[in-house]
Curated annotation (Swiss-Prot):
One of its GO terms (biological process) is spermatogenesis. GO terms for cellular component: sperm head-tail coupling apparatus. Belongs to the SPATA6 family. Residues 286-305 are annotated as: Disordered. The modification Phosphoserine is found at residues 260, 263. GO terms for molecular function: myosin light chain binding. It comes from the Eukaryota. InterPro entries: SPATA6_fam, SPATA6_N. The keyword Phosphoprotein applies. Keywords: Phosphoprotein. The lineage of its organism: Eukaryota, Metazoa, Chordata, Craniata, Vertebrata. Residues 286-301 have a biased composition (Low complexity). This is Spermatogenesis associated 6-like protein.
Length: 392
C-alpha cells in the first residue's frame, strides 16, 4: 500500500543584522522540497523580513511499504550536476531579448558536482514563450466589492424572490380575474380594451351568470362596409360569435360599436333566420307558464344591434334562464316596444339622408333591404297562441 508524506512548513522571519542590500527591489523566498517548488510573497529588502507564511508539500511514495522505507527514500539524494540561470537569460538568451525560433535547439553545459566522474554534461532543449494580455483577478474582485457596496441594503426580513416570479404571479393573478375567453391572450392594454368592446356582457359576472351556447338571435346584422370606420380588422365569424354571447348586463363602459346604427350608415344587411328555440318552446309548452314568457320578454333583447342603449336598462332586473326559458320571437314585439320601433324608424330615416348613404346609392342590395326596414309596420303585433310559429 503506497504511503503519502505531507509536510507543512511555517516561515516566520529572515534576519540578517547589520546588512543592507544595495538594491531597493522586493525580495522573496523560494523553497524546493520533494520535487515541489513554492515561493513566498514579495517583501521590502530591509532586514529583518517578517514573512509569517506557511507552505504545504505533498508527495506519494508508491513503492514504500512502511515509514522506514520512506525515510530511506528521502535520504537518497545525490547531486551530480546542476544548471542555474535567471529566467530572463534562460528564456531570451540573445542580447536583443528576442525569443529564439521554436524549432531551434539550444545547448547549455551543466556544472558538475565534486563526485561526478567526467566532463560536464550538455542539455539540448528548446523553449517557446508567449506574452499575452489577461484579466487581473484582484482588480475585478475590487470592482465587484465596490459595486456591491453601492447597492442599498434591504432592512426587511421577508423572503426575497426573483423579479420574474413576481411578474408571473401578477400575470397569474390578472388572468384569474378575467373571464375565460381572455385568458388565451396576453393581458396587454390593447387586448384588454379590445375584449371590453367585443364582449361587454361578460365583464360584470354575477353569482348566477351562465353562458348558454345554444342561444341564437333571430336577426343577425352584419357590417359589410370595407372601409371599417373603427379601423379594426374584425372577421365576420368573430363578429357574429361576439354578438351571440353579448347579453348587455350592467356594463359601466359606454361601448358603442356595431350595436349602434350611427356607425353603420346605409350599409346594413338584415338576414332573417328562424329561431331554433321556438321548436323547444312548442315541445315543452305543457310544463311552462306563459306568464314567465312575459316577464322575460321585456328583459331580453335578442338583437343587440337594434336595441343599443335600451338594452342596458331593461337587462338590469333580468336573470339567466335556461335554453327553454328563452323568449319567443313573437313576444319580442310586445306592445310595450312600440316606442322602440319609432326610434328605429327615425334613426333609419336619418341614416338614409346622411352623406354616407348618398355615396352608396349604387348598391342595390343595401338599398332594398333598408327600404324593407322602413316599410315595416310600427304598430304592435298581435299575440299568437303558443302552438303557432311565425317568422318575420
Amino acid at each position: 500500500m503506497p504511503l503519502e508524506v505531507v509536510v507543512e512548513l511555517q516561515i516566520r522571519a529572515i534576519s540578517c543584522p547589520g546588512v543592507f542590500l544595495p538594491g531597493k527591489q522586493d525580495v522573496y523566498l523560494g523553497v524546493y522540497l520533494m520535487n515541489q517548488y513554492l515561493e513566498t510573497n514579495s517583501f521590502p529588502s530591509a532586514f529583518p523580513i517578517m514573512i509569517q507564511e506557511s507552505m504545504r508539500f505533498e508527495k506519494v511514495f508508491e513503492s514504500a511499504v512502511d515509514p522506514g522505507a520512506v525515510v530511506d527514500l528521502l535520504e537518497m539524494w545525490d547531486e551530480l550536476a546542476y544548471y542555474e540561470e535567471n529566467t530572463r537569460d534562460f528564456l531570451f538568451p540573445e542580447p536583443k531579448l528576442t525569443p529564439s525560433h521554436p524549432r531551434r535547439c539550444r545547448e547549455v553545459l551543466m556544472k558538475t558536482a565534486l563526485g561526478f566522474p567526467g566532463i560536464a554534461p550538455k542539455i539540448e532543449f528548446s523553449t517557446r514563450t508567449a506574452i499575452r494580455e489577461c484579466v487581473f483577478l484582484h482588480r475585478n474582485r475590487f470592482l465587484e466589492e465596490r459595486h456591491e457596496s453601492r447597492r442599498p441594503l434591504s432592512t426587511s426580513h421577508e423572503p426575497i424572490f426573483p423579479l420574474n416570479t413576481i411578474k408571473m404571479k401578477l400575470k397569474e393573478n390578472n388572468l384569474n380575474r378575467l373571464p375565460k375567453g381572455m385568458q388565451a391572450r396576453a393581458p396587454s392594454q390593447y387586448s384588454t380594451r379590445h375584449f371590453f368592446q367585443d364582449q361587454p356582457a361578460q365583464l360584470n359576472l354575477g353569482n348566477n351568470f351562465k353562458i348558454s351556447g345554444g342561444s341564437k338571435p333571430p336577426f343577425v346584422v352584419r357590417h359589410v362596409d370595407s372601409a371599417k370606420p373603427f379601423g379594426e380588422n374584425i372577421s365576420e365569424h368573430h363578429l357574429r360569435r361576439s354578438r351571440r354571447k353579448s347579453k348587455f348586463s350592467d356594463f359601466p363602459f359606454p361601448t358603442r360599436r356595431a350595436s349602434s346604427l350611427d356607425s353603420l350608415a346605409a350599409n346594413v344587411k338584415v338576414i332573417k333566420e328562424p329561431d331554433e328555440r321556438i321548436v323547444l318552446r312548442s315541445d315543452s309548452s305543457s310544463c311552462l307558464d306563459s306568464s314567465q314568457f312575459g316577464k322575460s320578454s321585456s328583459s331580453k333583447q335578442g338583437d343587440a344591434d337594434f336595441h343599443g342603449k335600451a338594452s342596458f336598462a331593461t337587462y338590469q332586473h333580468s336573470t339567466s334562464p335556461g335554453p327553454l326559458d328563452q323568449p319567443l320571437l313573437r313576444e319580442r314585439f310586445h306592445p310595450g316596444s312600440q316606442s322602440t320601433w319609432k326610434n328605429i324608424h327615425e334613426r333609419v330615416c336619418s341614416l338614409l339622408t346622411s352623406h354616407r348613404a348618398q355615396l352608396h346609392q349604387n348598391k342595390e342590395d343595401s338599398t332594398s333591404e333598408v327600404n324593407y326596414i322602413i316599410e315595416r309596420p310600427s304598430y304592435p303585433l298581435k299575440k299568437y297562441s303558443l302552438h303557432e310559429q311565425r317568422y318575420f
